[in-house]
Amino acid sequence: MKILAIGGCGSMGRYAMRSIQNYSAIEEIIIADINKETAEVFADSLNHKVSAIRLDVNDASALKQAMEDIDIVVNTCGPYFKFGAPILSAAISSGCNYIDICDDWEPTIDMMKLDAKAKSAGVSATIGLGASPGLTNLMALIAIRELDEVTTVYTGWDIGGTS
């Protein structure tokens, strides 16, 4: 499996790539960032399966070229109101499965409108698979399954502030 990690040397992308780099199913991880030097430094800190490329996600042809022969696009490049739908559209057009950590509701709606296009292309697209939304939603689902009745679920997270 080949993974293109767009924004893969940002804080969330770094964590994700460190976490998956040693999975046996992964043949190659390509860290894609507008700053190739930063991407190379990070890629060099990981194992031999990881390389780096310069990618400007505003360049549609470069985006499409980067997705050639890719199985999964992991998009941790924000802001999602600007980059979410265009990167997902490129992944669908390229036949790449897609995962992101989008945490904004408006681009989520825009990306959900691409569902029929993704299904038609045989592409699986998972949006909002970060900490919140993502992990918090899965934890809520686990809790819901243990209860007889649920009327409302609220999720949130603490970023280290004081109350």
Residues of each region from the PLM?
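Short beta-strand element of Class I
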Residues: E28-I30
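N-terminal Rossmann NAD(P)H-binding glycine-rich loop of SDR-like oxidoreductase domains
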Residues: L4-S19
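Helix N-cap at the beta1-alpha1 junction of Rossmann-like dinucleotide-binding domains, i.e.
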Residues: G10, I34-E37
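Rossmann-fold NAD(P)-binding glycine/threonine-rich loop
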Residues: I101-S124
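Conserved Rossmann-fold cofactor-binding substructure of NAD(P)-dependent oxidoreductases
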Residues: R54-I70, T76-P79
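Short, conserved SAM-binding/catalytic segment
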Residues: F42-V50
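ADP-ribose/adenylate-binding Rossmann-like module
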Residues: P79, A90-T108
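Conserved anion/nucleotide-ligand pocket segment
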Residues: G130-S132, T136-S163
